Amino acid sequence: MSRKEIYEPRPRYPDGYNGNRAVKKSLSVLSLDNMKSTLSGLFAPLKLDEEQAEDDESLSSYEDYASRQIDDDLKKQRKKGITFIDYSSLITFFCKLCVIFGLGFVFTYLAEQIVQDAKLPLLTVNLKSWKFEPPWPAIFGFVAVILGLSYRRMDTKYPLGAAPLRPSQSSKWQWISRYLAAFATLLLSMKKLLFISNSHSIVALVASSASIWYIFDRSRNGIILSTITSVLGSILYYNLVDTSKIELNGVEFPEIQFRLWIPMILFSASTIVGNAGRLLF
C-alpha cells in the first residue's frame, strides 16, 4: 500500500481555530513572556555583602560629616553670641561696681573732711607698737562693694525677707540720687552733732538710722545685714582704731561719744550702700 493511500484522520475544529500547534505555540510564547515579566518584577539585581557594607559606610560617614558641620556652625554661633553678651555684661557689671565703690569712697572722704574741719585728728590703726593711717576712703569703698553684693545675694537666697518693691530700669538712677541725698543728710548730721551733747547726739543718730531704714529699705534682710555690719565694724573699731586724746577746739572730746556714734553711722551707711547694690545688681 502506497503512502498516498494511507488515510490520515483530520479532526474537525471550530471556525476560527488555527490548529492545535498554533495554540500551543501562542500559549508557550505568552507563558514565557509572563514568566520574564514576573521574574524581572520580583527579583532585582542583588549586591554583594561587601558592596552593601561600603554603601552603608559611605552613607554613615556622610551623615557624620553633615552632623559635625551642623554642630560646628551652632558652636560658632553660640560662641559669638556668648562672647558678645559676656563682654557687654562684664562692662556693665564693672560700671555698677564702680558706682557702689564711689558711694563708699565719697562718703568716707567727706566724713574725713568734716573731721578735719572740726580739727579732730584722723583715725589711726594701732597694732601693738605700729600706728598708721590707712586709706579709709578706699577701704570703705571696697566694703561698700561687698555690702552691695551681699544684699543682692541675700535677697536671692531668702526672697521672703527681700525688699517689697523693685523700681523699674528708668527710675534706678533717681533712687541713686536719693541715696546720695541721704548720704549728704547723714554727713550734715555728723557735722552738727559734733557740737551737741552726748545724749542728744545719740538720740538724733538713732532716729536718723531708723528713718533711713524705713524710707529706703523696710526689709528683714536689710536690717539683718545692716545690724551685722554695724556690730562687726564697731568691734573692729574698738579694738584697732586709736581714739585716745581726741580734742575738739582745744577741749578733750569724750571717747565714749565716738564709740556710740560708730554703730549708728555704720548702720545708716550700710543701709544706703546695700540698697544701692540691691538696686544695681
UniProtKB/Swiss-Prot annotation:
**What organism is this sequence from?**
Schizosaccharomyces pombe (strain 972 / ATCC 24843)
**Where does it reside?**
Endoplasmic reticulum membrane
Give the UniProt family note: Belongs to the INSIG family.
Q: Which residues lie on this side of the membrane: Cytoplasmic?
A: 1-93, 160-170, 216-221
Its predominant location is endoplasmic reticulum
- Which keywords belong to this entry? Endoplasmic reticulum, Membrane, Phosphoprotein, Transmembrane, Transmembrane helix
Q: Which domain of life is it from?
A: Eukaryota
Q: Which InterPro entries match?
A: INSIG_fam
| Topology feature Lumenal, residues | 121-134, 187-189, 257-260
TM ranges are 94-120, 135-159, 171-186, 190-215, 222-256, 261-281
Sites of Phosphoserine modification: S28
Topology with respect to the bilayer: Multi-pass membrane protein
Q: Which GO terms describe its cellular component?
A: endoplasmic reticulum; endoplasmic reticulum membrane
Q: Name one GO molecular function term.
A: protein folding chaperone
- UniProt protein name: INSIG family protein
Q: Name one GO biological process term.
A: ergosterol biosynthetic process
